[in-house]
């Protein structure tokens, strides 16, 4: 039996088309994926992300433990509520998961991990926590709703209490605050402003309905995927996994190499990979007809006339731009153009940094 989030009946009320997503029964769309996509880029949309896993890490060694566990350095977090994104790596430098960590105090952190990797993540975190004075607590009683888009914050403000609006006023990106019963964070997976709201399950339906009444469009996994790809954000299991190191997944910026004596898990392997040189993740743009898709081969010839091959990790038609975009893992020598093999012929594509749309506008 597939798991259902606490909002399952609300999805059915809005005529959602439900699909299996890593063992969860989730909405693919509510009628039109394209309309849902545009709602987030132009107005406000919301997603049920209650399948995500919230884990609280507490104890005297919480800071030391997370500095060992994660490739990014949570010691950078000194203001309560500040968050950072990064990878949890294995000893070979492969990405076990990408996650967000919120700093609540030196002895209390909140980590949000992907649903598809929940059991693996919890087992790994528990194993690595041995020898540290920490308590790892999964919070399955919490649901999560992401409200995203240029009007998302204004529409959410009509639903929040006075206390909650005061708490989020002027909150910068990548912060989270507990305000009443809600943990409200300025994070997201769309390239737009907005909130990810962690809410007790008992209150989730009422919050969802209040946002609906405020004119927020419910959006499914289909729009979530085209939005995150336009924003150049990785999907775990597709753009990276345990066989891929963060340098080859456009996550190099999330590795805190300094201080040099912080021995995070995977550091030694990653230093060797860095010294040798790694593949990289790039963006591809194809303005002619057709759609770039996952697993299509990518070819280019380097300055010495040698042909190299890579592969598309994620590809789609971009509703915002009106043509196809993709992310591809390729050897580092790639130039400004490449060729993609589709329908037994090669088509020329532009190669750019993997970010296509930010705040509703073309980003390249």
UniProtKB/Swiss-Prot annotation:
Top-level taxon in the UniProt lineage: Bacteria
Keyword Membrane among UniProt keywords: no
GO biological process: glycine decarboxylation via glycine cleavage system
Keywords on record: Aminotransferase, Transferase
InterPro entries: GCS_T (IPR006223), GCS_T_bac (IPR022903), GCST_C (IPR013977), GCV_T_N (IPR006222), GcvT/YgfZ/DmdA (IPR028896), GcvT/YgfZ_C (IPR029043), TrmE/GcvT_dom1 (IPR027266)
Pfam families named among the record's database cross-references: GCV_T, GCV_T_C
EC number(s) given by UniProt: 2.1.2.10
GO molecular function terms noted in the UniProt entry: aminomethyltransferase activity; transaminase activity
Catalytic activity: N(6)-[(R)-S(8)-aminomethyldihydrolipoyl]-L-lysyl-[protein] + (6S)-5,6,7,8-tetrahydrofolate = N(6)-[(R)-dihydrolipoyl]-L-lysyl-[protein] + (6R)-5,10-methylene-5,6,7,8-tetrahydrofolate + NH4(+)
GO annotation, cellular component aspect: cytosol; glycine cleavage complex
UniProt KW Metal-binding keyword: no
Top EC class for this record: transferase
Record text on subunit structure and interactions: The glycine cleavage system is composed of four proteins: P, T, L and H.
Assigned protein family: Belongs to the GcvT family.
Function: The glycine cleavage system catalyzes the degradation of glycine.
Protein name: Aminomethyltransferase
Origin species: Shewanella amazonensis (strain ATCC BAA-1098 / SB2B)
């Amino acid at each position: 039996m597939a798991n259902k989030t606490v909002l399952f009946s609300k999805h059915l009320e809005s005529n959602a088309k439900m699909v299996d997503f890593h063992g969860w029964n989730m909405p693919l769309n509510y009628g039109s994926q394209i309309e849902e996509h545009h709602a987030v880029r132009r107005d406000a949309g919301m997603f049920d992300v209650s399948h995500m896993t919230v884990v609280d890490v507490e104890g005297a060694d919480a800071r030391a433990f997370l500095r060992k566990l994660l490739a990014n350095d949570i010691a950078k977090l000194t203001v309560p509520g500040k968050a950072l994104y990064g990878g949890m790596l294995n000893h070979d430098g492969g990405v076990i998961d990408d996650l967000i960590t919120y700093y609540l105090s030196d002895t209390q952190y909140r980590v949000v991990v992907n649903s598809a990797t929940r059991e693996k993540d919890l087992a790994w975190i528990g194993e690595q926590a041995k020898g540290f004075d920490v308590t790892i607590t999964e919070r399955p009683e919490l649901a999560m709703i992401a409200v995203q888009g240029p009007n998302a914050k204004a529409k959410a403000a009509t639903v929040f209490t006075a206390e909650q609006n005061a708490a989020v006023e002027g909150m910068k990106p990548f912060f989270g605050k507990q305000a009443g019963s809600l943990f409200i964070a300025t994070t997201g997976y769309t390239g737009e402003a907005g909130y990810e709201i962690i809410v007790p399950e008992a209150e989730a339906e009422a919050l969802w309905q209040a946002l609906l009444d405020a004119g927020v469009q419910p959006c499914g996994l289909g729009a979530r995927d085209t939005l995150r790809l336009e924003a150049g954000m990785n999907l775990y299991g597709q753009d990276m996994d345990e066989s891929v190191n963060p340098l080859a997944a456009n996550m190099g910026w999330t590795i805190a190499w300094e201080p040099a004596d912080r021995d995070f898990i995977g550091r030694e392997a990653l230093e060797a990979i860095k010294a040798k040189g790694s593949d990289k993740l790039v963006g591809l743009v194809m303005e002619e007809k057709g759609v770039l898709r996952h697993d299509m081969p990518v070819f280019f010839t380097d300055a010495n006339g040698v042909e190299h091959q890579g592969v598309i990790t994620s590809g789609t038609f971009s509703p915002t731009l009106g043509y196809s975009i993709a992310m591809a893992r390729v050897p580092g020598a790639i130039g400004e153009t490449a060729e993609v093999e589709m329908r037994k012929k090669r088509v020329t594509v532009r190669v750019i940094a993997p970010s296509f749309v930010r705040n509703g506008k073309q980003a390249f």
